[in-house]
Design a protein with these regions (language model features):
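Conserved PLP-enzyme active-site core in the AAT-like
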Residues: 1-101, 105, 114, 118-122
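General structural feature for long, well-ordered alpha-helical segments within catalytic domains
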Residues: 1, 25, 62, 66, ...
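Conserved C-terminal alpha-helix-loop-beta "cap" of PLP-dependent enzymes
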Residues: 116-126, 130-183
Length: 183
């Protein structure tokens, strides 16, 4: 894909938001043609432990541009906020490969169940998994809300909560989600 984009525009900068994609393949985006990749430490690379943080990786000039844009003038990537959480971030990196592997196995199991229910998940259990996300059409908004509420009710954390759709910055439609996790 990167080669096709560069053939159309040699000056293109290929940017990848790799959230949920880390540790799912043997190569990361910058190894296959991306100029810059970003992600969140509270997702895959944080192993579900890191309470905050993100990363920027790629071409040195682009990383520096981002660092100067996202930090205080003159500080660049040499100084930044850690909120007293480096231990959690390092621990998250240590746990991340195992946690991501478990998440992919769980996604494959869920995809099998969804197929048995006729819900046509994407990706399918037999497809290559480039991230830990599974999509499916619940049919109606009420069915999706019920699905999320069922997941939440069976979760070890906040099982008393009843997810409801609400506006979310960056989305045109209301968002509903369930998470029985600690982070």
């Amino acid at each position: 894909m990167a080669d096709t984009a560069r053939a159309a525009n040699p000056d293109i900068i290929i940017f990848v938001d790799n959230c949920y994609g880390e540790f799912t393949q043997t190569q990361e985006p910058c190894q296959v043609g991306a100029d810059i990749a970003v992600g969140s430490l509270i997702k895959n690379p944080g192993g579900g432990i890191a309470p905050t943080g993100g990363y920027i990786a790629g071409r040195k000039d682009l990383v520096e541009l981002c660092a100067y844009r996202l930090n205080a003038p003159g500080l660049g990537k040499d100084l930044g906020c850690t909120l007293e959480t480096p231990r959690d971030m390092y621990l998250g990196f240590y746990y991340a490969p195992g946690v991501v592997c478990e998440a992919i196995k769980t996604a494959i199991y869920a995809q099998c169940m969804l197929e048995l229910l006729g819900k046509n998940p994407v990706p399918r259990y037999c497809d290559d998994h480039n991230d830990i996300v599974t999509c499916f059409d619940a049919g109606t908004a009420d069915a999706l809300i019920g699905f999320c509420q069922g997941i939440q009710a069976a979760s070890p954390v906040d099982s008393y909560a009843a997810p409801e759709p609400s506006p979310e910055p960056g989305y045109t439609d209301e968002v509903v989600m369930a998470s029985g996790s600690f982070t």
